[in-house]
């Protein structure tokens, strides 16, 4: 696992972003524009190795790293939001070598004020969360046989 970290605020000023943060923010798809207000943006990359088997491990490793980063963030009173909505071709600007795949960008920071958020994002976030029923996602014996 490797991480490219861009920071906003801190010693450079409340809203000033370093060049890495600005570049990472530019990779995000429009629906993730709220992340421009984060304190940090983290590009999560994993080495896909030499063959298909190790490439599959890269995805598992990236997911585990993101999960652990999220748990640590929450334990420190922060929010971590992983996003797959970014331009996966442009991380080459960071010198990401061949064979290393960018999997996600994680926004890290404190929860913002919805009074100052984009109205569409505030409305989307206020909707009740709906999840599929366990019977639709967990099976026993064979695919489609509810647990």
Curated annotation (Swiss-Prot):
Pfam family, one: Nitroreductase
SUPFAM superfamilies hit by this protein: FMN-dependent nitroreductase-like (SSF55469)
GO molecular function list: oxidoreductase activity
Top-level taxon: Bacteria
Protein name per its UniProtKB record: Uncharacterized 15.4 kDa protein in ask 5'region
């Amino acid at each position: 696992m490797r991480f490219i970290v861009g920071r906003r605020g801190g010693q450079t000023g409340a809203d000033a972003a370093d060049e890495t943060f600005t570049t990472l923010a530019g990779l995000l798809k429009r629906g993730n524009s709220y992340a421009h207000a984060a304190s940090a943006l983290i590009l999560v990359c994993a080495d896909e190795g030499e063959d298909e088997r190790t490439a599959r491990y890269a995805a598992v490793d990236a997911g585990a790293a993101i999960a652990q980063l999220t748990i640590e963030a929450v334990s420190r009173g922060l929010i971590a939001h992983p996003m797959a909505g970014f331009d996966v071709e442009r991380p080459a600007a960071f010198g990401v070598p061949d064979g290393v795949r960018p999997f996600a960008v994680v926004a890290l920071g404190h929860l913002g004020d919805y009074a100052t958020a984009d109205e569409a994002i505030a409305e989307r976030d206020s909707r009740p969360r709906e999840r599929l029923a366990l019977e639709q996602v967990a099976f026993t014996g064979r695919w489609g046989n509810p647990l």
